[in-house]
Amino acid sequence: MRIRRPLTLLVIGALFLVLGAAQFAVSPGASAQPFGFNKLTPNQQRHVSGLLSLELGGAGLKAAAPARTSLSPVTSPGCSVNLGSNIKVNQNCLNLTDPALNGRGQAQNETWVSADPLNSQNIVAGYNDYRRGDGTCGVSYSTTGGQTWADATMPNGFVSGAAYGGAPREYMQGSGDPSVEWDTRGNAYYACQEFKRGSGVTEDADQSSGFYVYRSTGTNGASWNFTGRPVVEHNDVAGAGDFLLDKQLMAVDDGMNSPFRDRIYLTWTTFAADGTAYINEASSADYGEHFSAPVVVSTDSNLCANPATSTHPDGRCDNNQFSDPFTAPDGTLYVVWANYNNATSGGGDNHSQVLLAKSTDGGATFSAPVKVGDFNELPDCAAYQGGADAFRACVPEKGATAASIFRASNYPYGAVDPRSPRTLAVTYGSYINRNSNEANGCTPAGVSTTTGGDLYTGVKTEGACHNAIVLSVSKNGGAAFTGSSKDVRTLPVAESTAGQRTSDQYFHGMRFAPDGTLVVGSFDRAYGTDETTGFSDISVSTSENLASFGHVQRVTTSSMPPETQFNGLFYGDYFQLAVTGDIAHPVWSDTRATDLFLCPGTGTVGHPPQTCAGAGANFSPANDEEIYTASVSAG
């Protein structure tokens, strides 16, 4: 039987650090109450941000901040440079921040990147950017094929107030969850989630939010239209906190002969007060100026035998997250996502499933969901990392240490083979896979009764459990996939070296090259002592036959230490790469730069300010999160 889990509040990306005290509608006749951490269900607590759990759960930021006695003077100004072939994308020097606010005013993470199909020299990268203190949608652009970069500014300080009570302006406090794509005429588009925090963090009760799309016309990402055009907006000026909009991703129809050429699609999750979490979609046929009314994508299927609610108003597939839209040359829109409504076989079985639906009428209607494949989520962090990051999944390193505690999840991406418009590739992470299963000591062990997180034997044992990126393929336009009936333990994985077969790969990205080569990149612990220290690298691999992978390349010039900003709990939620011709451009959040603080006793009368390095909450020395890229062969 299915191990019943409450509906998860999978608040990710920018929401990790900006929602503050969200609120839900309460029972009829009761007044609205702040929706704090202690009112979340255990499974909801597992899926909200680690930083949010610290703030609302009582631990506070200062409790885990670097001790000032551990700080040591340094002479570096915090202006990182290229690291060999690894090119720095964001162009700022490091802001000094108080140890209690480590990460705020500094970090960049959660990357997306896309290249101009008309000119491969033009590349735009989006990321969460905390330089101003709170999160915002950061953007950098290159007109040299990724060899040099400049920062631009997303003009998202306020949006029209028409949907928020009619005032001329609605000033948003935070934003993030970036995705960037180009149309076939050289326009770039940037999707950004924007919101207000509410009274739990500020004196303003407003918890309004919305998704907005910005367009860059004629400047290749150097400038963007103002104000952002709304996709969907939620008026919550009163702070009722009745539902949450989360995790939007975008696709632009790039089929030159498509009946929906240049149509823009956004998909997202709506966490509603009735306990549901449906995937929704909206589209624009006028270059992002206006968007259609939302359409529910994740409707009903016998695959969803365990609905999260008794009413499930739009179908039994009511517990979802991590949607990704993509298009075919004939104009078909596909949406793939993670679903948590599947039945399980009992015992320790804790698998979930990836579903897909398609639209042939420009996003107006969708087919019933079909199964892409099963997957197993990353393990419960607290169970294996000394209680750290409770109610979250993470990527534990092997052995006795507990440095790798940042929130992580497995998610799907999809794309259509340019050589065969009915051939679809979907990649997603799975903790159980052909190299990590019962045969080598990694056995699913149900879920934690405390947090609802997934449990396994062998999580901290070298050579036993490790995450991998698996591939499921459809040859008939999404009607069926190789993973629909096959065990995840038999599917191809994007890692083919001996080191990768016994180490973790996570936070992956994927795209097809023009010649039909599938290119997959990921964070990778196959190098040096990464698997036992919690360090990581970036790797890229390719598949020419959609059955096996090779041509594995280590992209990073040295390993990246466990991230320490936001107390080691937030490293973003996803990663992407672009492919131009036979060149792949992965863009990632990098932790090799040392974080800096004001030295104790300086900045006082008679003692000029000096900068110091210091210990992080989970690793020493504390480090920054910056954006890097590289250009590597995709052939």
Feature map (PLM): residue ranges:
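Compositionally biased non-globular segments, especially hydrophobic aliphatic-rich helices
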Residues: V11, L17, F24-P28, N225, ...
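Bacterial N-terminal signal peptides that target proteins for export
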Residues: M1-G13
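C-terminal PAP-associated
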Residues: Q33-G635
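C-terminal region of N-terminal signal peptides and the immediate post-cleavage residues
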Residues: V18-L40
